[in-house]
Swiss-Prot record:
GO terms for molecular function: mechanosensitive monoatomic ion channel activity. Channel that opens in response to stretch forces in the membrane lipid bilayer. May participate in the regulation of osmotic pressure changes within the cell. This is Large-conductance mechanosensitive channel. Pfam families: MscL. It is found in: Cell inner membrane. The chain crosses the membrane at residues 19-39, 41-61, 78-98. Homopentamer. Its main location: membrane. The keyword Hydrolase does not apply. It comes from Roseobacter denitrificans (strain ATCC 33942 / OCh 114) (Erythrobacter sp. (strain OCh 114)). It is a multi-pass membrane protein. Coiled coil: none annotated. GO terms for cellular component: plasma membrane.
Length: 142
């Protein structure tokens, strides 16, 4: 059983997946910072300083000064502002991943195009062709 596990874990797909998960976790931190530190202030500038993450509705009917106050009071809360921020985070992540994939595909296509261009160039005469030409030239002389 241990040998089977070693075989499974040493396969390329598992290692690629592990690297992807680690990079994804780091990427999530970067995107979260991008949204919190750059996008939210920009959105707040155009919305008059509104912070979406503070938008909520207390389901117990009471009025609370903030989302933190409502959750501290133990009130059931519909925190739709957090959902809005999660959607914004998702859209930014999806856009960045789209741009990365598009860039990688463009680079791959360019590399494949260069390979095809090299393959399409007419090849010079082969050794056999040269030997045939020499044979024919010698036959004409002698």
């Amino acid at each position: 059983m241990l040998n089977e596990f070693k075989t499974f874990i040493s396969k390329g797909n598992v290692m690629d997946m592990a690297v992807g998960i680690i990079i994804g976790a780091a990427f999530t931190a970067i995107v979260s910072s991008l949204v919190a530190d750059l996008v939210n202030p920009f959105i707040a500038l155009f919305t008059g300083g509104i912070d979406f993450s503070g938008w909520f509705y207390a389901l117990d009917g009471e009025t609370y000064a903030s989302l933190a106050a409502a959750t501290d009071a133990g009130a059931p809360v519909f925190a739709f502002g957090n959902f809005i921020m999660a959607v914004i985070n998702f859209l930014i992540i999806a856009f960045v991943v789209f741009m990365l994939v598009k860039t990688v595909n463009r680079i791959k296509d360019a590399a494949e195009g260069e390979k095809e261009a090299v393959a399409e160039e007419p090849a010079g005469p082969t050794e056999l062709d040269i030997l045939k030409e020499i044979r024919d030239a010698l036959a004409k002389q002698g």
